[in-house]
A protein has these predicted regions:
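N-terminal core-binding DNA-recognition domain of tyrosine site-specific recombinases/integrases
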Residues: 3, 17, 70-157, 175, ...
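Active-site/catalytic core of tyrosine-dependent DNA strand-transfer enzymes
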Residues: 17, 266-275, 281-349
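Catalytic-site neighborhood detector that most strongly recognizes the C-terminal catalytic loop/helix
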Residues: 172-173, 180, 231, 241-245, ...
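Basic, Lys/Arg- and aromatic-enriched nucleic-acid-binding interface segment
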Residues: 123, 130-137, 141-143, 156, ...
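C-terminal secondary-structure termini that scaffold catalytic or DNA-interacting sites
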Residues: 225-236, 241-285, 294, 405-461
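Short, polar N-cap/turn motifs at the start of nucleic acid-interacting alpha helices
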Residues: 222-231, 332, 350-351, 370-393
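C-terminal catalytic core of tyrosine-transesterase DNA break-rejoin enzymes
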Residues: 156, 203, 207, 214, ...
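N-terminal DNA-binding module of tyrosine recombinases/phage integrases
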Residues: 7-111, 303-317, 397, 412, ...
Length: 461
């Protein structure tokens, strides 16, 4: 049985339990209101009676998350996910609730934690300034999603009875509409581009809807631009890898799962490594057909690359990469982004990020194929088709307007339907104002005599 003891402005629920060593212990739990204490008392008694009571556990959140990462994370995460999730834990979870006990995390604590996060300064990434002053709502959503997953395991491991993050109320996230270039601006940018690597990358991003990592991880063995392919409109690329940077810790923890190649670093003491890895989702592994012009551009680029190989000889490090540095080594995204910024400045183009070319591609394709979501999804590699409908709904709305216009011309413009005219309104009968008529007759005896003569004439007829 449990009891409630009032302590100044709070209430304690006191009960005995048997720990994992078989010893009887007493537990005091503090609650702010009598109503909360009564609810907890009933909960404890009910669980003890039906055998579902979990003994108190003093494990701290930080220790629990360490166990969670080393058991769950190692099995479920790739290296990029591992780095991202452990960064959230180190920057925004452990500093705030890491010293709390797992069993002390209640829905009320979760609500206060979210409020604290909204006032927490953003942590800068290495060599990069934070984009916002405080933690964004999008980041808070990622943090709570991670904790919801972690505490689901805590329930499974019988550390807690229920997940306090299940019904967490998140701050509203407003997704800003991305600025993108239209087709004419992209054409102008390509005309002004003088950097060969950037030129290839821009064409692949726009024509093939590729992500940056997919462009930089593309190898020549997956580029099919032979004469017979082009003649049959069957030139294509196959996306099966992406270039990214991962921490040595993630690689050591997870092994080489989903990693195709680890590039030898130029400076061996760095804490990260460039790797070629499998894309995050199965839908990202895909075949994308090439416009003929892009196929010819790639052929010319390969020819110039082969000439460079012959000139450099053994100095060229051949990793079979399509977009590579002059010595053959992988080209990181920061190099492309820097050249892209220089191009925008030189050509006086609107300021967009390189990734926006992928959004321009999706927008352009949806217009060309009149909203064919499945075909567009095949090129973009989105895991869920809903991701396209949410982001590009305005394009689909334009096509829906066109649908109404087509419906009008195809159906309602039929001459037979035009014969169905709407009913005409019947003219209303004129009414006589008797009071005004009597007044006029009194003022004009001549009018009264004329009217009397007319009435007599009508009767005679």
């Amino acid at each position: 049985m449990a009891s409630i003891i009032k302590r100044k402005k709070s209430y304690s629920v006191v009960y005995n339990y048997v720990d994992e060593n078989g010893e009887t212990k007493q537990k005091w739990e503090t609650w702010h209101t009598h109503k909360e204490a009564l609810k907890r008392k009933a909960e404890v008694e009910n669980q003890q009676n039906n055998g579902t009571f979990l003994p108190p556990n003093n494990q701290k959140v930080s220790d629990f998350l360490y166990d969670f990462v080393s058991t769950y994370g190692e099995k479920k995460w790739g290296v990029s996910m591992y780095d991202g999730q452990t960064a959230l834990i180190a920057n925004y979870i452990n500093p705030i609730i890491g010293d709390m006990e797992v069993q002390d995390i209640t829905p009320r604590v979760v609500d206060k934690y979210i409020q604290t996060l909204q006032k927490t300064p953003s942590v800068s990434k290495k060599n990069r300034k934070a984009r916002t002053e405080f933690v964004t709502n999008q980041t808070i959503e990622k943090i709570i999603k991670l904790l919801r997953c972690a505490f689901k395991q805590a329930v499974r491991w019988e550390l807690i009875g229920k997940n306090p993050f299940d019904n967490a109320v998140l701050p509203k996230t407003e997704y800003k509409k991305r600025d993108i270039w239209d087709a004419e601006t992209i054409r102008l940018a390509l005309d002004q581009c003088t950097d060969s690597k950037l030129y290839i990358a821009m064409n692949l991003a726009f024509a093939c809807s590729l992500r940056m990592g997919e462009i930089l991880g593309l190898t020549w063995k997956n580029v099919h631009i032979e004469d017979e392919n082009i003649a049959a409109d069957n030139a294509y690329i196959y996306i099966e890898a992406e270039l990214t940077r991962a921490s040595k810790q993630a690689i050591e923890m997870l092994g080489q799962k989903d990693i195709y190649y680890i590039f030898t670093p130029l400076m061996p003491n760095t804490s990260t490594r460039l790797i070629l890895k499998k894309p995050k989702t199965d839908s990202s592994v895909r075949k994308v057909w090439l416009p003929k012009t892009v196929a010819y551009i790639l052929r010319e680029w390969k020819k110039s690359q082969e000439e460079l190989k012959g000139f450099l000889g053994d100095e060229y490090q051949d990793f079979d990469l399509v977009v590579a540095l002059p010595n053959g080594r992988p080209c990181e995204n920061r190099i492309i982004e820097k050249e892209f910024s220089l191009l925008k400045q030189k050509a006086g183009l609107p300021n967009v990020v390189f990734h926006s070319l992928r959004h321009s591609s999706t927008t352009y394709k949806l217009k060309l194929n009149h909203g064919d979501l499945k075909a567009t999804q095949g090129d973009t590699g989105h895991a869920e088709i809903d991701m396209i409908t949410k982001v590009y709904a305005h394009i689909l709305d334009e096509d829906r307007k066109i649908n109404a216009q087509k419906f009008e011309s195809a159906f309602y413009a039929n001459p037979d339907l035009r014969k169905l005219t709407p009913p005409q309104e019947q003219p209303q009968a004129q009414t006589v104002d008797l009071a005004a008529l009597i007044e006029q007759l009194q003022k004009s005896p001549e009018l009264a005599s004329t009217l009397a003569a007319l009435i007599a004439g009508q009767k005679a007829v």
